[in-house]
Amino acid sequence: MGALCSSETYMLDKETYKKQVEHNKMIEQDLDKDRKLKILKLLILGPGESGKSTTIKQIKIIHDEGYSVEEKLIRRHGIFMNILEGIEEIHLAVGRENKSYKNPLSFDHIHEVRMFTENFKKADEADKILGAEVINAIQKYVKDETVAMMLRDKTVYNIDDSTIYFLDNFSRIIQKDYLPTEEDILKSRVPTSGVIQYKIMLKNFNFKIFDVGGQRAQRRKWLHVFDDVHAVLFITSLSEYDQVLREDATVNRMKESLNLFEKICNGRYFINTAMILFLNKIDLFEIKIKHTNITVALTSYKGPQERDSALDYIRKRFVSLNKNKKRSIYEHVTCATDTEQIQVVIDSVIDVVIQHTMQKVGIQ
C-alpha cells in the first residue's frame, strides 16, 4: 500500500512537473518585477541654476517631513552667505552695465562686505553670524540710488531673484533668533557638487532621486548614475535666455540647455526611459519677456514679444529635439518656488514614473 502510494505520488509529480516548472517560472518573473519596482530611480538633470535643487527641496517639504530645527539652523549659514554673495553680484552688475554709484561711500561698503565675506568663509560654523558692521554696510549699500534702481529692475540687470528676496527680508534675517522658514530655504542657493542622492517613499514606492551638479565640470560625474534609471526629469530655466554661463561667458544659457537636452534625450542610456521636461522660472520669464525678446538666443523666432507665443516656441524647440517619436516628452511649465503649483506637477511626475516603469516590466 505504501509502495502504491509512493508510485502514485511519483506518477503525479511526473505528470505535473512541466506545469509546476512553468508556474514557478511565472512566480519568479513576478518576484523579479517586484524587485525591479522596489526602488524607482529618478534622475534630475539640467544646466546649473535651473532649479533642480529647489525642486528637490519641494519634494522634501511636500512629501517628506520638511526641515527640522537642526536642519534649518544649518541652512541659516548658507542664507547669510547668499546675501554676501548677492551684494558682490550687484557690485559686478554695476560695473558690467557701466553704471556709477551715486554715493561715493558705496565702494567702502563693498570693501567692508568683501573683507567680512573672506573671514566668514574661514570661520567655524558656530561663529558664522552677520556682525553689526557688515549689517550696517549692507543696509547703506542698498540705499544707493543706482543699486536701488537695479534691484527694482532685477530682470533687466539679471540680479538673482533670491538676492532680491533676502534683501527684502533682511530686517527679519538679521535678528539673533532668526530661524529660516521653508520659503527662505526654497530661495536659498547652494550649488550642487557631484551627485546627491535622496531616498523617499512616494505613493507607496521607494524612490531614489539623484540631484546632479549642472555646471559643465560636474557633468562627467553623471555617468555612474545612468544605469537602470526609470525616468529623467530635465529642468531648464525659461528666464535665462539673455544670460551666459558662469563658467563660459561666450555661451548663451538657453542654447546650452537646448544642446544638453538633445544629448540627454537621445543618449544611449535613456532609450527606454521616461523623459519629463520642466520649463522652469515662468514667473521671471513673464517679467523679462516684456523688455527682452527671446531672439537674443533664438534668432529664428518670428513671433510677437509676448508670453504665450514665446513660451510655445521654446517648448516646441525642446520637444522637437526628441528623435524617438515613439516616446512622449511630458512637459510642465513651472515655478519651482511656488509650493502649491509644484505640488500638483510633482504628483503628476510621480504618476508618470510609476506608470512608465510598470509598463516597462509588463505590469499593466
Swiss-Prot record:
Q: According to the UniProt record, where is the region G4 motif?
A: 276-283
Report residue spans for region: G2 motif.
184-192
Extract the CDD domains matched here: G-alpha
Q: Where is the lipid attached (S-palmitoyl cysteine)?
A: 5
The record, for SMART domains, names: G_alpha (SM00275)
A GO cellular component annotated for this chain's UniProt record is: heterotrimeric G-protein complex
**Any idea which positions bind GTP?**
46-53, 186-192, 211-215, 280-283, 336
G5 motif, as annotated region: 334-339
The biological processes this protein is annotated with in GO are: adenylate cyclase-modulating G protein-coupled receptor signaling pathway
User: For binding Mg(2+), which residues are annotated in this chain's numbering?
Assistant: 53, 192
Write down the InterPro entries for this protein, in alphabetical order.
Gprotein_alpha_su (IPR001019), GproteinA_insert (IPR011025), P-loop_NTPase (IPR027417)
Region entry G3 motif, spans = 207-216
Sequence ranges assigned to domain G-alpha in this UniProt record: 38-364
Q: Where is the lipid attached (N-myristoyl glycine)?
A: 2
Any idea which UniProt keywords this protein has?
GTP-binding, Lipoprotein, Magnesium, Metal-binding, Myristate, Nucleotide-binding, Palmitate, Transducer
UniProt family annotation: Belongs to the G-alpha family.
User: Subunit structure of this entry?
Assistant: G proteins are composed of 3 units; alpha, beta and gamma. The alpha chain contains the guanine nucleotide binding site.
Name of the molecule in the record: Guanine nucleotide-binding protein alpha-8 subunit
Gene name tied to this protein: gpa-8
